[in-house]
């Protein structure tokens, strides 16, 4: 009997590792506490259509990741997004064009992880609470008390604070991961029946509770029935308002949006708030991945590198590479 490899987390990092291991002929089984894959790369279904509440776009600087992105493009899962960009600084809104190539999933961000997952076995709505090792193999315990296993190795591909709670069997790794701080982000979606009279499709914001905003419908193949906008608050504002109600957050960020935009803003016909508790690492690390190869446990995620989508993908590749290297 072939004992599969367990991978906890179906964001970009976990699926990147899963793809690399599957390509090398290994069996994997994925676990995720959510109802679908993607993590911060997921799109939220709503009455206003699919909304990219998390990652807004991504860039490809590393040659290996750029190759993967070109494959996704050829398969029809991603497209370039060329928004009319603005910058808001010192109370002034000004055009801010650049040469950066930006990619988005189509018809939503979750198209990418859905394609990466393919037909790999996965247990959704399954929150793993404990990872423990028997004499030969690993087993996982979920929040319902159900046991999963045996597994030959475990890869934990979650935000650092969630990973550290699963590393009781690997105290050295646990202490490193426990030192990683991640910043929160409040995200708000607003939809308007009458399109806002502005050419702006994306905006980097300074001196405001907002950090970024985007016209969701300006992305390729998005639903354009309503004029949908995604607002991201700064890490600082999000931390200060971590426990605010969704209604309070929507009201405050809607107000900040109205202050900076250079047109009349009607009342939205739809609004939604989502709190990303672990949106991005507070500092940069250059680990690639973390591992205790003798134990057979590996940790990866965007926080092991740049905090970007590319960093998550590269971290998953590195975790898989280390695991395969140890098997040789």
Curated annotation (Swiss-Prot):
E.C. number(s) listed in UniProt: 1.6.3.5
Signal sequence interval, chain numbering: none
Binding site for substrate: 57-61, 96-98, 185, 308
Binding site for FAD: 13, 32-33, 40, 56-57, 128, 302, 309
Reaction(s) this enzyme catalyzes, per UniProt: 1,2-dihydro-beta-NAD + O2 + H(+) = H2O2 + NAD(+); 1,2-dihydro-beta-NADP + O2 + H(+) = H2O2 + NADP(+); 1,6-dihydro-beta-NADP + O2 + H(+) = H2O2 + NADP(+); 1,6-dihydro-beta-NAD + O2 + H(+) = H2O2 + NAD(+)
A single MF term (Gene Ontology): NADP binding
InterPro entries xrefs: Amino_oxidase, Bac_renal, FAD/NAD-bd_sf
Domain of life: Bacteria
Cofactor(s) the protein requires to work: FAD
Record has Flavoprotein as a keyword: yes
Name of a matching Pfam family: Amino_oxidase
Uppermost EC category: oxidoreductase
Record key words, sorted: FAD, Flavoprotein, NAD, NADP, Nucleotide-binding, Oxidoreductase
Family, per entry: Belongs to the bacterial renalase family.
Primary role: Catalyzes the oxidation of the 1,2-dihydro- and 1,6-dihydro- isomeric forms of beta-NAD(P) back to beta-NAD(P)+. Has a preference for 1,2-dihydro-beta-NAD as substrate. May serve to protect primary metabolism dehydrogenases from inhibition by the 1,2-dihydro- and 1,6-dihydro-beta-NAD(P) isomers.
Name of this protein: Renalase
Organismal lineage: Bacteria, Pseudomonadati, Pseudomonadota, Gammaproteobacteria, Pseudomonadales
